[in-house]
Every structure is written in C-alpha cells, then in structure tokens.
Amino acid sequence: MTAPFPNPHFAISLYCSDFRNPAPQVEYLNTVADSYHVDIMDGHFSPSMGLCTSWIEQMLPLSTLRNEVHMMVTDPDHWIDQLVAAGATMLTPHVESLGAHAFRTLRIIRENGCGAGVAINPLTPFADVENLLERIDLITVMTVE
C-alpha cells in the first residue's frame, strides 16, 4: 500500500492544464508541489466532465510526484480498475456516492495498492464521514456543491 501523504501537503490540480501539451507544466510543477490532484467526473455525479484515464496515463510518466484522483462519479467501483491501471496512487471517491458499500469500496481501493480517501460536499454532514476515519488516509473537503 502507498504510504499516506505528508501532513499537510500541497496538491496542484491539473484540471486547468493544457491537455494537448502537459509536459512543460508537469515538469515545472514537479519542482513546486507535493502531489497532483486529478479530477475525474462522469457527467452524472457532477454535471461537468473531468480528465479521462487516457490523459492520466499520458501525464503520469512525466510526473515525479504522487497523485490523488478525486472521483466525482456516481459509481466509484466502476472506475477503480481503470484508475489503478492508469497509475493512480490515491483514490478519493465522494462519501455521497459510496452509500452502503463504503467499507467494501475502500477495501477494494487498498487491495489495489492505492491509498484511500473520501471527499465530502459542503452540505453533507461531517457525521457521514466519521465512521470511515479509521479506513482513510485523506479527506477532501469541497467548497462548492
């Protein structure tokens, strides 16, 4: 299993990077960040679309840093194998999408060699995360719903 991220750490989002030519940006960011934050969106859980697994596969060989893949998706289990194959080191599904299968999903993430985190939306009570604290390495607290 991947060791937890240092606490605190500085993660750079790649959501606004140049998707056609990530190399210059990634090479520079390798020198100033602790890790990368990569947004995956399915257009259902989040109305937007995020980065795709093929882009992650192209970007990761350029990176010397660990990455946190923020899974803004309705069915996190569907994405785990693809994201692990792409090189993810930390998978962070939303607590709102985990439902009754939270423990199972977090276990599957760890069994695949990744760190496990959860993200929480601003209107979701923190109590929804409390029972997961012993099973996670990271919490991403959203500032937008």
Give residue spans per PLM region:
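Conserved N-terminal beta1-alpha1 strand-loop-helix module at the mouth
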Residues: 1-92, 97-103, 107-116, 129-136
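Histidine/lysine/aspartate-rich catalytic loop segments that bind and position anionic ligands
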Residues: 119-145
